[in-house]
Amino acid sequence: ASLAESGFDPLSRTCRFMLTEEAHHMFVGETGVGRVVQRTCDLMKEHDTDDVRPFGGIDLKTLQKYLNFHFSVSCDLFGQELSTNAANYYNMGIKGRYNESKIQDDHQLYDSAYSVMECKDDKISMAEVPELNSVNERLRDDYIDDSELGLRRWNKIIEDAGIDFRFSLPHRAFHREIGQFASVQADPEGKLLSKREWDSKKEQWLPSDDDHEFVQSLMIPVTEPGKIAGWIAPPKGKINRQPFEFEFVRFH
């Protein structure tokens, strides 16, 4: 998204085209996870239990662990909170901020400030920093805001099922390996922990070896038309107006 705002026109055009395709990928991913959540809720109601593993479903607590993992490693992809490289790329017009043209400022950022979360003296607090150096963090903030929208849709599935559980995004300091939070350990609420505390509790928040083994055990191919794996609900919509039982793929 930042490269789509590039002042180098060939790069900008290419990335804008890629974003159109990426929107489809995001839709498939979000609705796919939603179908897993729907199936879990269906099994919980059918068997009146939170533990749906014996019935071939992935329990909500395990899904939360995977959410914690993927969100935290995705936050690392945006790089350091303060970055001179990002500032230089912005100054050269190679990259921009998300929806740059909609931001009401001078787009030069020489005298602008931005609030960034920092960790000093074993405390997490907000600090005003030069906005030009915090381009990465602004993109990370935009990513977190967008992730919240998807989370609400998954939580709506759970709410509609009448189940007292809600997914939540972990704190941005949780399980980080890049940036200023890489040197500390924090729980999903942002409380700083000692290494001993982290080691003793991390499997409460992240997928354990047993969790990985269980999920992998469910990955059994289902190729018969009209049938679907037991851990995911059927899609709500139709593809090309064909019924769910249609033989979309033929195996020879």
Feature roles, as predicted:
Residues A1-S2, G32, G230:
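Domain-scale activation on soluble regions of proteins
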Residues P10, V36-V37:
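Long, histidine/aromatic-enriched segments associated with O2/redox biology
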Residues K45-H252:
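Extended, helix-rich structural scaffolds rather than catalytic motifs
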Residues T20-G34, T40, M44:
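Extracytoplasmic, non-cytosolic globular domains
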Residues P10-A23:
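Alpha-helical scaffold segments that form or flank carboxylate-/histidine-based iron centers
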